[in-house]
Amino acid sequence: MGSTIELNNILDEFEALVPFVIPVALGALSLLFLYFIKGLIFAQKKGYAKLPPVPVVPGLPLIGNLLQLKERKPYKTFTKWAQTYGPIYSIRTGAFTLVVLNSTDVAKEALVTRHSSISSRKLSTALKILTFDNALVAASDDNDFHKMGRRHMVTNILGTNAQSPQEAVNFKKMFAYELFGLSLKQALGQNIEDSVYVEELGTTLSRDEIFKILVSDVLDGWKAVMNSLIKEQTNRIASGEEVNSFLDYLLCEAKTLTTEQITIFVWEAILEAADTTLVTTEWAMYELAKDQNLQGLLYEEIKNVCGSDKITEEHLSQLPYLNAVFHESLRKHSPASVALLRYAHEDTQLGGYYIPAGTEIALNIYGCNRDKNEWESPEEWKPERFLLDKEKCDPTDFYKTLAFGAGKRACAGSLQAMLIVCTSIGRLVQEFEWRLPRGGEEENDDTATFTTHKLHPLHAILKPRNHYSLVS
């Protein structure tokens, strides 16, 4: 009897709780159901649930792989690791995890297929300050500002309408001087003939000093120099003088840009035209001077197409071997060995591996272009590889070697670089026979700066091929 009473009391208490328990239970079940459905949809949509993590290069506690990156050229260490850990792996640099891509296929997947998930740049505080909070087009995130800046550069400065016999010649010094003049004319509308007074520094700088500050060894005073150059050209424009330049275009069309943004836009145009094109041209001329047979093939092609006419941009589409020389030089001697770091702002996948949001991604261009699965004898300079493979010989494909990136973040200046470099190489070979001085054949190293310049500038012996000179 007592047991029955106790049971009834328990049931009465439970009935009293029913109005409260049922909603709570239903709510919990609903939340559980929604969580399950959300997870199921996410897994089906993204396909990441069962993906393995990226292979990890073993390191030490706390510092990770920092001690293994003692070499001044980390891209070579990245390439060695790829032989052991595969085309995609991760390393730790202190508290940060970095995924390194060493395969063209995986790199293009990141740049093109997964662009929407991996389109941001990850810049240090120092670089953000240097670039006026990511105002540099090449370094900015893929946002409205980047698209606007890229549009201005492509429309004006980078478009198709832009503009002793036995003594070794210092090619780099000679060519850098001419390229710097070209970049100044494009960006500002006028070359620097003598010197410029820089008000903020309180001194007058020569053309060579300005080149060093802006291009070859970027120093703290670059902003002051750019301000003086822009002020001088702005005064010319204000006086009514017609100046057809990138600066003139920005002042007229880009009304939303700040003074600082205009400054860095113009500086970027000068830097890229005067530096990266120099790197590719110098390496190409080194390889041609080293191999007389390949140089002879290029000269014969130019002679057959151009005859006695000087090579121009209009001839380039008829010169497949010259295009092959250009692309092979980019492959073996990419102006940048590692691209600016990317940042995965949402979960994604690469190469069949799970990439969580927040991961930093490094594209090892050097490693991609040394991948033996992609390139036969990658250590050799062989322009003919771009003629034998139909997929690689398309002269309109600037992204086969990843030197210009790929996808929506591809280099805006790829067409300009091709026109300048190919025309320059063609004219130099058309006018002169090139050879290296005795002992110059084996020097084949590069520096570890922003761009991969030759460790020692190219010195070559030039022999005129024709009666007229290069400057005629």
Region roles according to the model:
Residues G2-L32, R92-V99, N161-K185, E193-E200, ...:
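Cytochrome P450
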Residues E6, R121-L130, F145, Q163-T281, ...:
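Cytochrome P450 heme-thiolate monooxygenase catalytic core
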Residues L34-V54:
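Transmembrane-cytosolic junction motif
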Residues G47-A162, F175-A176, F180-L182, V198-I210, ...:
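Cytochrome P450 substrate-recognition site 1
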Residues L66-G86, G221-E232, E253, D309-G352, ...:
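Conserved cytochrome P450 K-helix E-x-x-R motif and the immediately C-terminal K′/meander segment
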Residues T276-Q295, Y299-E301, S414-E431:
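Cytochrome P450 catalytic-core helices
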Residues L363-K392:
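Conserved cytochrome P450 K-helix/beta-meander segment immediately N-terminal to the heme-binding cysteine loop
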